[in-house]
């Protein structure tokens, strides 16, 4: 009898599963019908057996060139992971012919595999390449794959001419390839504007589960995103529920104001349903082309409070090199060192040299320099004994806070902080300061009493990081007049509230931010040797202005 009951239960569960199985017939779509052979695009194959970013890997790359292509004009680009998925070449043949897609070259990249000397697989690189949330995969496409593609010739001798305009470039993938497509566009919106992800692996493999929160916090990027997933998509429950995380991603895109479309069905973790959706996904992603994909408007209250929607980042063309940090100066300007010269720059890009540095002298701020453990203000000695000094903040009344490891010989140095290892910022009300440490996601908050004593240091501010555990050191930090903290990080400028939580992230096409300065209404950032400026709604606080109160945000 027990066996009979068990058999009945199994039969019932199998029957219910069969009833839930995805069995909807797909309507006829002319884009899925193979065209005559003489109308098909050409497919060129090559093998990559060297890589700087993924050492030892070997992979096949397939390049689709449509019949309509002529090398006299740059073609659009579609990058796809895992080779030719979705019967994509047939769909491209049809959609390009019908005019529903522009002339597009397809680049289909298989994941890397490492072999031993006997051609046995030693390492499958797919998860590393596709599920990582850093910018390595995008850099690999840009610096290693596309140069080889552009070096090819078609069988009739045409060169491969691909547009570098992100508005002309799309990227797609399934499963881990789906998150790889999104990650490439997210990290490099200067490369891709259009994304199709199917059964995307936005789960806890290599950090993808953090994306929903990060999308909500980050200033919208010019991306158009089409998502497909099935209600029963669970490849491995150890890592999470695929469909649940796709729902969270769709919710985040909606909150952040993206052009995003989704198709949910009864499917599981399979390429079948992404293949059915592929023609419509391509139509939707390219709808209205060549009109540019634009940024949306986020519901993020912090972004709304600090950003002026009339202004975006502006690149400042400068011929001088930038050595080290940048510092706020009067009238919305900044200063920085360029060799032995101290240069001043305004928001219009007007550059002038204001002073020179002596041998061994280091710029520490507007008018501030350090030489032989001695601090100078406009050439006049202020304090001695600043050993291993990393940062100085000038307060009102000719007082200073220093980040160093020493007993300073000066009454003008009100506080010496040794907790940090990189940078320092004093809060607008002078009641605490923040310092940056290396190899951690936290910043140190230290209370300052009225006598200048440093008390109760604590790892208080928590930063986001998508670099997959490299723990890249953050750059310098600055406060606005409302007590919000701005931090230069590899992800962009992260803005934290009074309680140490990042609530906004400002990203740039150039990638990570090495240094920043908030001078009046203007936020300046350095990305390598590139400088950008943005006019803000928020106002930067310069400690030289004196202590200023601001409204508490409470403990919520």
What residue ranges belong to the model's regions?
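Beta-rich, blade/repeat-based domains predominating
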Residues: 319-332, 357-373, 385-405, 415-433, ...
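Beta-propeller fold detector
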Residues: 314-317, 352-356, 382-385, 415, ...
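Blade/loop signatures of beta-propeller domains
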Residues: 293-312, 404-406, 452-454, 543-544
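Short loop/turn segments immediately following beta-strands, especially the blade-tip
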Residues: 446-453, 535-543
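Glycine/small-residue-rich hydrophobic helix-like segments
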Residues: 220-223, 448-511
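Beta-propeller domains
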Residues: 331-355
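Non-catalytic cap/lid and distal C-terminal segments of serine-dependent acyl enzymes
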Residues: 19-298
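Beta-strand-rich domains and repeat architectures in extracellular enzymes and scaffolds
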Residues: 302, 312-340
């Amino acid at each position: 009898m027990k066996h009979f009951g068990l058999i009945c239960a199994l039969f019932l569960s199998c029957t219910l599963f069969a009833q839930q199985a995805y069995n909807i017939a797909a309507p006829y779509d002319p884009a899925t019908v193979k065209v005559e052979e003489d109308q098909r695009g050409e497919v060129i194959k090559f093998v990559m057996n060297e890589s700087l970013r993924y050492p030892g890997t070997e992979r096949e790359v397939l390049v689709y060139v449509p019949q309509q292509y002529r090398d006299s004009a740059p073609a659009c680009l579609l990058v796809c992971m895992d080779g030719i998925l979705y019967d994509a070449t047939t769909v491209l043949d049809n959609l390009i012919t019908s005019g529903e897609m522009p002339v597009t070259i397809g680049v289909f990249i298989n994941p890397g595999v490492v072999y031993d000397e006997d051609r046995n697989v030693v390492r499958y690189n797919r998860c590393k390449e596709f599920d990582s949330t850093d910018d390595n995969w995008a850099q690999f496409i840009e610096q290693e794959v596309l140069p080889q593609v552009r070096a090819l010739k078609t069988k009739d001798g045409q060169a491969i001419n691909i547009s570098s305009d992100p508005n002309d470039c799309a990227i797609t993938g399934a499963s881990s390839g789906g998150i790889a497509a999104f990650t490439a566009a997210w990290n490099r919106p200067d490369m891709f504007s259009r994304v199709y992800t199917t059964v995307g692996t936005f789960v806890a493999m290599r950090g993808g589960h953090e994306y929903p929160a990060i999308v909500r916090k980050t200033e919208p990027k010019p991306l158009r995103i089409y998502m497909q997933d099935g209600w029963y998509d669970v490849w491995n429950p150890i890592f999470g529920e695929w469909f649940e995380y796709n729902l969270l991603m769709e919710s985040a895109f909606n909150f952040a104001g993206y052009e995003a479309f989704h198709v949910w069905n009864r499917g599981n973790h399979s390429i079948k349903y992404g293949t059915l959706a592929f023609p419509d996904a391509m139509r939707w992603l390219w709808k209205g082309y060549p009109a540019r994909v634009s940024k949306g408007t986020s519901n993020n209250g912090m972004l709304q409070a600090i950003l002026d929607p009339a202004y975006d980042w502006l690149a400042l063309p400068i011929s001088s090199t930038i050595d080290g940090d940048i510092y706020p100066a009067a009238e919305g300007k900044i200063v920085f060192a360029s060799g032995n010269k101290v240069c001043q720059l305004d928001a219009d890009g007007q550059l002038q040299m204001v002073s020179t540095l002596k041998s061994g002298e280091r710029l520490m701020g507007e008018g501030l320099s350090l030489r032989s453990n001695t601090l100078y203000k406009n050439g006049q000695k202020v304090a001695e004994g600043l050993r291993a000094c990393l940062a100085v903040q000038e307060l009102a009344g000719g007082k200073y806070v220093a980040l160093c490891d020493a007993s300073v010989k000066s009454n003008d140095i009100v506080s010496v902080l040794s907790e940090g290892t990189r940078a320092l910022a004093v809060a607008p009300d002078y009641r605490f300061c923040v310092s940056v440490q290396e190899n951690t996601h936290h910043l140190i908050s230290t209370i300052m009493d009225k006598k200048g004593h440093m008390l109760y240091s604590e790892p208080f501010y928590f930063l986001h990081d998508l670099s997959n555990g490299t723990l890249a050191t953050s750059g310098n930090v600055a406060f606005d007049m409302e007590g919000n903290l701005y931090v230069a990080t590899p992800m962009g400028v992260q803005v934290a509230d009074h309680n140490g939580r990042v609530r906004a992230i400002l990203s740039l096409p150039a990638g990570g931010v090495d240094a920043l300065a908030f001078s009046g209404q203007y936020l300046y950032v350095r990305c390598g040797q590139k400088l950008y400026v943005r006019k803000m709604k928020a106002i930067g606080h310069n400690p030289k202005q004196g202590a200023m109160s601001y409204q508490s945000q409470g403990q919520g």
